[in-house]
Amino acid sequence: MTANDPLSDALSGIDNAESVGHLTHTVAPASNMVGSVLEVFYDRGYIDGFEFVDNGKAGRFEVELKGAINECGPVNPRYSVGADGFEQWEKRYLPARDYGSLVVTTSHGIMSHYEAREAGIGGQVIAYVY
């Protein structure tokens, strides 16, 4: 099986593992973008942690789940959003105001939309989690 979109594959695997109650999930192949998105999930309290395992190829992430994710997924196509335009995408992808988080790639790195709004910067919405 080839991975056309590693972020989409990683998020669907995590979502499926959470829905059946697994405590861990392996995300392979690893990439910098997937690692940054997992860091946002960890910072926002949706996963217990993750570890990069080098297997001599692309590597993999071992993700420790905690049952806090109801749904997560990629946003395709990746929409550009200004610093004041996150509310429209919150309404579209999140079930309620201030519940869940959008993952945004900015010129300052990948972060949650709360951090981007606080910093006053825009970017592209790449994923959501709640």
UniProtKB/Swiss-Prot annotation:
GO cellular component: ribonucleoprotein complex; ribosome
Keyword field: Ribonucleoprotein, Ribosomal protein, RNA-binding, rRNA-binding
Family: Belongs to the universal ribosomal protein uS8 family.
Organism field: Halobacterium salinarum (strain ATCC 29341 / DSM 671 / R1)
Gene name of the record: rps8
Molecular function terms from GO: rRNA binding; structural constituent of ribosome
Name of this protein: Small ribosomal subunit protein uS8
Tree of life domain: Archaea
UniProt-listed NCBIfam families: PRK04034.1 (NF003115)
Biological role stated in the UniProt entry: One of the primary rRNA binding proteins, it binds directly to 16S rRNA central domain where it helps coordinate assembly of the platform of the 30S subunit.
GO biological process entries: translation
Subunit and interaction comment: Part of the 30S ribosomal subunit.
